UniProtKB/Swiss-Prot annotation:
Function of the protein: Required for the assembly of the V0 complex of the vacuolar ATPase (V-ATPase) in the endoplasmic reticulum.
Subcellular compartments: Endoplasmic reticulum membrane; Endoplasmic reticulum-Golgi intermediate compartment membrane; Cytoplasmic vesicle, COPII-coated vesicle membrane
Chain segments annotated as transmembrane: 37-57, 69-89
Organism for this UniProt entry: Drosophila simulans
Region (Disordered): 1-26
Record's keyword terms, sorted: Cytoplasmic vesicle, Endoplasmic reticulum, Membrane, Transmembrane, Transmembrane helix
Top-level taxonomy: Eukaryota, Metazoa, Ecdysozoa, Arthropoda, Hexapoda
HAMAP family linked: VMA21 (MF_03058)
Membrane topology field: Multi-pass membrane protein
Pfam short name (any one): VMA21
Name the record gives this protein: Vacuolar ATPase assembly integral membrane protein VMA21 homolog
Family recorded in the similarity comment: Belongs to the VMA21 family.
Residue ranges, Lumenal side: 58-68
Length: 105
């Protein structure tokens, strides 16, 4: 009779493990979304900045040579890259609000 009680009690212990696993999966998915966002920002922001500066801002509004337009656009893209990297490092160092992990045994 005691083995049946142990089996019945052990069967109910699976629910907290499943809830804990779902919590870990949710945290992993949130981390994945954050890293994916910053990767896309680091890749696409400088490219977008280069072409916006070159095509819309510098060529149309300023009367400067093509080489200077390319140089200014490249400098703008590098600045945009550094801003994106700085945002990523800031987020990684200080973390998101409420992301303090608690130790569970």
């Amino acid at each position: 009779m005691s083995t049946k009680n142990k089996k019945a009690a052990g069967g109910n212990g699976g629910a907290p493990k499943q809830t804990r696993q779902q919590s870990h999966d949710s945290q992993d998915y949130s981390s994945f979304k954050t890293v994916l966002f910053y990767c896309m920002l680091i890749v696409f922001l400088p490219v977008l900045t280069f072409f916006v500066l070159k095509g819309f801002v510098l060529d149309q509004f300023l009367d400067i040579s093509e080489v200077k337009v390319n140089i200014a656009s490249a400098v703008g893209a590098v600045v945009a890259l550094h801003i994106a990297l700085g945002l990523y490092i800031y987020r990684a160092y200080f973390g998101a609000p409420g992301s303090k992990g608690s130790k569970t045994d």
